[in-house]
C-alpha cells in the first residue's frame, strides 16, 4: 500500500460546478473529464456531477468513453435496483433518514414517476437502468475512426466530428445500422488543432447531403487564448463562430471552455464545457487579484455569498458579470486536491554535507533532513529540485537536493522539535500550495501538475 495519500474533495468539485452554472445562467454546463478527470478520477467525478444535474461529459478517446460508460452503467444498475427495492421506504419518509443522500434522491427523483401508478390506475410500471444511462451524454473529442465506430455505437458514445473523413465514416455506419447516429461537429475557428477547416465548412453549407443520416446535436469550437480576457483573438474566434452558425440556425452551439465562461454571455451559447475550473485551477490569468465586487445571491437550499473581481460588461446585453475569486466556495473556486506524504527517514547532517544525486545541495549549517516517499515516478517533477517547498503544520519547508524517482529530501531544521518525527505528514499539494502555485515554480500549468499525478498514490474521495 502506498504511504502517500491523494485526497480528492468531490464536494469542492461540485461547488465549482455550481458556481460555473450560476455564471452561465440558462446555458447548460458540461464537464471535461478526459485524461481520467485530469488525473483525479473520471468515474468518481462524473457520478458526483450527475448528482448536480450535469449530463454532458467530454472525453478524449473512445477508450476513455467506453470505460466511463461501463462504470456509469454498472452504477445506474445498482442505484436502480436500490430504488426499486426501497422505493416504498423512500416515498413514505425523508430519504436522508433512510441512508439515501438528498443529492442521490434528487438525481433519481424521476424514478417517482417510473414507479408511480399510471394515470388510469393500472399497475405500477418502471423504466430500466439503460434508460437512466442514456440520459448521460458522453462526447468523444477526438472523433470517430474506422476501428472504433462500432464501439461508439455499442456504448452510446457521441463523436465530435473533426473533418470530412470522420463525417464520411460516421455516415457509412449510419447507413450500415439504418438509423440516424448522433454527432457533434467541431468547427476550427482559429486554434488550428482539430476541427473542420473553412473550406470543409463551406462544403457542408453548400451540400447538406454530406450530413445525411447524422443527428447533428451541437456545433462546437474551441478558444485558443480564453485565459487572456482582453486578447482580441477571443472576439475574432467568436465572430467567426457566429458567422458559421448562421448557416445552421436550428443546431445548438458550444464554445466556452473554463476561460470562455468568464468572457461573458456572448460566449456561453447553449452549452459550456469547463475542465480546469472544475478542478480549482485558475481559468483566467491573475484571476485572484483585484477584489472589487461582492454579490449575494439565493441558492436552492442556502444563502451564499460570492466574492468577485474585474466587473466587466457583456457586450450583447449591456449587463455586468463578475469573475470569482479563489478560495472556498463562498469566495469562488475551491482547490479539491490534497497530496500528503509521511516522513519515513530523519537524519542530522553537519555543515558542508552533500544531499542527493550529483551533490547539488550542500548544507550551510548543521541540519535536520527528512525524506519523503515520492518522486518523479509519482509525477513530482524533477524540476522541483532545490526550489520547491512542502508544508508541515502550515509551515513552509524547502526541498533540498535532486528529486529522485521515489524520494525527496526536505530541510526541517527550522521546524519546532515537536513537529519533527517519523510519520509526520507533509502537505505536497493543498490549500497552502495549490496546483497553480506549484506549476508557476517550474514554468508549467496546473493542468500538467494534476494530470501527472501518479498511480501509486492511495486515492481517497470525500
Swiss-Prot record:
Function, in words: Catalyzes the interconversion of L-alanine and D-alanine. May also act on other amino acids.
Statement: the UniProt record of this protein carries the keyword Isomerase: yes
InterPro entries assigned to the protein according to its UniProt record, in alphabetical order: Ala_racemase, Ala_racemase/Decarboxylase_C, Ala_racemase_C, Ala_racemase_N, Ala_racemase_pyridoxalP-BS, PLP-binding_barrel, RPE1
Modified residues annotated as N6-(pyridoxal phosphate)lysine in this record: 34
Active site residues per record: 34 (proton acceptor), 357 (proton acceptor)
Entry similarity comment: Belongs to the alanine racemase family.
GO biological process: D-alanine biosynthetic process
Residues annotated to bind substrate: 193, 405
Record-linked PROSITE patterns: ALANINE_RACEMASE
EC primary class: isomerase
Name of the molecule in the record: Alanine racemase
Keyword NADP (UniProt): no
E.C. number(s) listed in UniProt: 5.1.1.1
Cofactor(s) essential for the protein: pyridoxal 5'-phosphate
Source taxon at top rank: Bacteria
Domain called RPE1 insert: residue spans: 286-332
Recorded metabolic or biological pathway in which this protein acts: Amino-acid biosynthesis; D-alanine biosynthesis; D-alanine from L-alanine: step 1/1
Reaction catalysis annotation: L-alanine = D-alanine
Pfam families for the chain: Ala_racemase_C (PF00842), Ala_racemase_N (PF01168)
Gene Ontology MF: a single term: pyridoxal phosphate binding
The entry's keywords: Isomerase, Pyridoxal phosphate
Record-linked SMART domains: Ala_racemase_C
Disulfides per UniProt: none
GO terms for cellular component: cytosol
Database matches in Gene3D superfamilies: Alanine racemase, Lyase, Ornithine Decarboxylase, Chain A, domain 1
PANTHER family given in the database record: ALANINE RACEMASE, ALANINE RACEMASE, CATABOLIC-RELATED
Amino acid at each position: 500500500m502506498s504511504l502517500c495519500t491523494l485526497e480528492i474533495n468531490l464536494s469542492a468539485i461540485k461547488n465549482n460546478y455550481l458556481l460555473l452554472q450560476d455564471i452561465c445562467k440558462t446555458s447548460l454546463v458540461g464537464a471535461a473529464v478526459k485524461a481520467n478527470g485530469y488525473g483525479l478520477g473520471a468515474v468518481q467525478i462524473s457520478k458526483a456531477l450527475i448528482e448536480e444535474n450535469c449530463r454532458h461529459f467530454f472525453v478524449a478517446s473512445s477508450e476513455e468513453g467506453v470505460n466511463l460508460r461501463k462504470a456509469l452503467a454498472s452504477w445506474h444498475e445498482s442505484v436502480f435496483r436500490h430504488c426499486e427495492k426501497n422505493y416504498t421506504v423512500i416515498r413514505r419518509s425523508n430519504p436522508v433518514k433512510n441512508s439515501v443522500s438528498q443529492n442521490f434522491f434528487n438525481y433519481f427523483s424521476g424514478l417517482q414517476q417510473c414507479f408511480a401508478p399510471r394515470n388510469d390506475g393500472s399497475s405500477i410500471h418502471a423504466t430500466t437502468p439503460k434508460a437512466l444511462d442514456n440520459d448521460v451524454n458522453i462526447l468523444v473529442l477526438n472523433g470517430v475512426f474506422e476501428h472504433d465506430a462500432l464501439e461508439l455505437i455499442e456504448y452510446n458514445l457521441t463523436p465530435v466530428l473533426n473533418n470530412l473523413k470522420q463525417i464520411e465514416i460516421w455516415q457509412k455506419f449510419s447507413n450500415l445500422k439504418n438509423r440516424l447516429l448522433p454527432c457533434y461537429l467541431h468547427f476550427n475557428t482559429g486554434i488550428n488543432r482539430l476541427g473542420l477547416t473553412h473550406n470543409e465548412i463551406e462544403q457542408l453549407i453548400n451540400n447538406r447531403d454530406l450530413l445525411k443520416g447524422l443527428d447533428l446535436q451541437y456545433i462546437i469550437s474551441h478558444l485558443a487564448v480564453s485565459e487572456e480576457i482582453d486578447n482580441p483573438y477571443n472576439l475574432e474566434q467568436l465572430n467567426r463562430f457566429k458567422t458559421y452558425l448562421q448557416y445552421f440556425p436550428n443546431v445548438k452551439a458550444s464554445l466556452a471552455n473554463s476561460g470562455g465562461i468568464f468572457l461573458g454571455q456572448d460566449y456561453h451559447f447553449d452549452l459550456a464545457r469547463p475542465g480546469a475550473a472544475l478542478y480549482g485551477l485558475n481559468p483566467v490569468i491573475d484571476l485572484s487579484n483585484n477584489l472589487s465586487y461582492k454579490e449575494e445571491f439565493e441558492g436552492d437550499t442556502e444563502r451564499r455569498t460570492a466574492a468577485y473581481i474585474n466587473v466587466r460588461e457583456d457586450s450583447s446585453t449591456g449587463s455586468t458579470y463578475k469573475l470569482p475569486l479563489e478560495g472556498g466556495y463562498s469566495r469562488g473556486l475551491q482547490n479539491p486536491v490534497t497530496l500528503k506524504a509521511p516522513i519515513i527517514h530523519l537524519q542530522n547532517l553537519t555543515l558542508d554535507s552533500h544531499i542527493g544525486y550529483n551533490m547539488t545541495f550542500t548544507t550551510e549549517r548543521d541540519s535536520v533532513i527528512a525524506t519523503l516517499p515520492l518522486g518523479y515516478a509519482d509525477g513530482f517533477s524533477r524540476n522541483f529540485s532545490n526550489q520547491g517547498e512542502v508544508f508541515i503544520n502550515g509551515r513552509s519547508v524547502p526541498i533540498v537536493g535532486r528529486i529522485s524517482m521515489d524520494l525527496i529530501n526536505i530541510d526541517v531544521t527550522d521546524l519546532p522539535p515537536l513537529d519533527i518525527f517519523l510519520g509526520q505528514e507533509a502537505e505536497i499539494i493543498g490549500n497552502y500550495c495549490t496546483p497553480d502555485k506549484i506549476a508557476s515554480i517550474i514554468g508549467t500549468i496546473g493542468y500538467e501538475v494534476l494530470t501527472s499525478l501518479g498511480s501509486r498514490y492511495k486515492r481517497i474521495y470525500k
